[in-house]
Curated annotation (Swiss-Prot):
The keyword Amino-acid biosynthesis applies. Pathway: Amino-acid biosynthesis; L-arginine biosynthesis; carbamoyl phosphate from bicarbonate: step 1/1; Pyrimidine metabolism; UMP biosynthesis via de novo pathway; (S)-dihydroorotate from bicarbonate: step 1/3. Small subunit of the glutamine-dependent carbamoyl phosphate synthetase (CPSase). CPSase catalyzes the formation of carbamoyl phosphate from the ammonia moiety of glutamine, carbonate, and phosphate donated by ATP, constituting the first step of 2 biosynthetic pathways, one leading to arginine and/or urea and the other to pyrimidine nucleotides. The small subunit (glutamine amidotransferase) binds and cleaves glutamine to supply the large subunit with the substrate ammonia. Residues 1-196 are annotated as: CPSase. InterPro entries: Anth_synth/Amidotransfase, CarbamoylP_synth_ssu, CarbamoylP_synth_ssu_N, CarbP_synth_ssu_N_sf, Class_I_gatase-like, CPSase_GATase1, GATASE. Keywords: Amino-acid biosynthesis, Arginine biosynthesis, ATP-binding, Glutamine amidotransferase, Ligase, Nucleotide-binding, Pyrimidine biosynthesis. This is Carbamoyl phosphate synthase small chain. L-glutamine binds at S51, G245, G247, L274, Q277, N315, F318. Coiled coil: none annotated. Gene3D superfamilies: 3.40.50.880, Carbamoyl-phosphate synthase small subunit, N-terminal domain. Its EC number is 6.3.5.5. It comes from Buchnera aphidicola subsp. Acyrthosiphon pisum (strain APS) (Acyrthosiphon pisum symbiotic bacterium). It holds the Pfam family GATase. PANTHER family: CARBAMOYL-PHOSPHATE SYNTHASE SMALL CHAIN, MULTIFUNCTIONAL TRYPTOPHAN BIOSYNTHESIS PROTEIN-RELATED.
């Protein structure tokens, strides 16, 4: 059971709105862009998603921490969020996989967090006014003026290259598949039994993305975001995967140029989230900042090609502008919430992308068929080359 949460804390937004609560994480002060996530489950996966770099995440579900934490549910090697805002911290964790309480996990990872916040009110403010910068101070004095000034002066995430900061610094291989509850472990495949070799550009990749590719017979080489395209081609990949990641894709010139280089070849390309936006930019489309973004596991998306609706996991603050799209871009998916572009394919290349997270974690797996389509493109290309 958690100890008594007696330390006071304050959250202040850049418009001057303040919320008083209790500190449930590390001591200190933090500042970032405040966003909200509507997922009911998967709080550990959310806070370890590199896509949340430089952001303070508000979880709209009222009860957080009830299943504790464990290392198997981490989506990366560290926590990238700037801070966490919740309504109520569960004082007990009831799950056979629990290894550590959520509050202890936050403190151990030096994450400042605040509870006892009216998250419904906060979410309404963000929906009405758009995402705002905010500051959390864990302090008995709850110094409002310091928090307000820090929130007011925090840098905008627009035109900021965050992918380079969260990306791996060296090339590595990955052969771990999905978690199997029967064996209570992740399965792995002998390298000789893999069917395909896929190079993954790490712009902030989640582990479950890698696992779902391995599940489909892919041996993975994960490369840094700034990797030269010639280095990738020397690895002789059967396919290239462009991962998720944080922030604005527009400053990532190195990635855009690399993708344009790959589009001159016939190697199948699949991008998600930030990778989707980078493929769009490389193909001549434009990107715009959204009012408050899409963050949650309940977003309905229409699959235009197959005329069906899928429920998806989403986490992005930028979107592809649908006005004046290049002729070779075909819209394959659209949001049923606001009509924004959710998927595209290039009519003249074996390249496609999806704005949401088909790997979920957390969220539904309705869009996992996109991984199968990627494999289908790889098989088709290998068949063409062998004939």
């Amino acid at each position: 059971m958690e100890g008594v949460l007696s330390q006071l804390a304050v959250l202040v937004l850049e418009d001057g709105t303040k919320f008083h609560g209790r500190a449930i994480g590390a001591k200190g002060i933090t500042v970032g862009e405040v966003v909200f996530n509507t997922s009911i489950t998967g709080y550990q996966e959310i806070i370890t998603d590199p896509s949340y770099s430089h952001q303070i995440v508000t979880l709209t579900h009222p009860h957080i921490g009830n299943v504790g934490t464990n290392s198997n549910d981490e989506e990366s090697s560290k926590i990238y969020i700037k801070g966490l805002i919740i309504r109520d911290l569960s004082l007990t964790a009831s799950n056979y996989r629990n290894k550590k309480s959520f509050s202890s996990y936050l403190k151990e990872n030096n994450i400042i967090a605040i509870s006892d916040i009216d998250t419904r009110k906060l979410t309404r403010i963000l929906r009405t006014k758009g995402s705002q910068n905010g500051c959390i101070i864990e302090d008995k004095k709850q110094n409002y003026s310091i928090a307000y000034n820090k929130a007011k002066n925090f840098i905008s995430l627009q035109d900021l290259d965050l992918a380079k900061k969260v990306s791996t610094k060296s090339i590595y291989n990955w052969d771990q598949g999905s978690f199997t509850f029967k064996k209570n472990n992740f399965f792995s495949i002998n390298k000789q039994k893999f069917l395909f070799h896929v190079v993954v550009y790490d712009f902030g990749v989640k582990r479950n993305i890698l696992r779902m590719l391995v599940d489909r017979g892919c041996y993975l080489t994960v490369v840094p975001a700034i990797t030269d395209p010639k280095t990738v081609l020397n690895l002789s990949p059967d396919g290239i995967f462009l991962s998720n990641g944080p922030g604005d894709p527009r400053p990532c010139d190195y990635a855009i140029h690399a993708i344009q280089y790959f589009l001159k070849t016939n190697i199948p390309i699949f991008g998600i989230c930030l990778g989707h936006q980078l493929l769009a930019l490389a193909s001549g489309a434009k990107i715009v900042k959204m009012k408050f973004g899409h963050h949650g596991g309940n977003h309905p998306v229409k699959d235009i090609k197959n005329n069906r609706v899928i429920i998806t996991s989403q986490n992005h603050s930028f979107t592809v502008d649908t006005e004046n799209l290049p002729n070779n871009i075909e819209i394959t998916h659209s949001s049923l919430f606001d009509g924004t572009l959710q998927g595209l394919s290039l009519t003249n290349k074996s390249a496609f992308s999806f704005q949401g997270h088909p790997e979920a974690s957390p969220g539904p797996h309705d869009a996992s068929y996109l991984f199968d389509y990627f494999i289908k493109l790889i098989v088709s290309q290998k068949t063409t080359l062998s004939n």
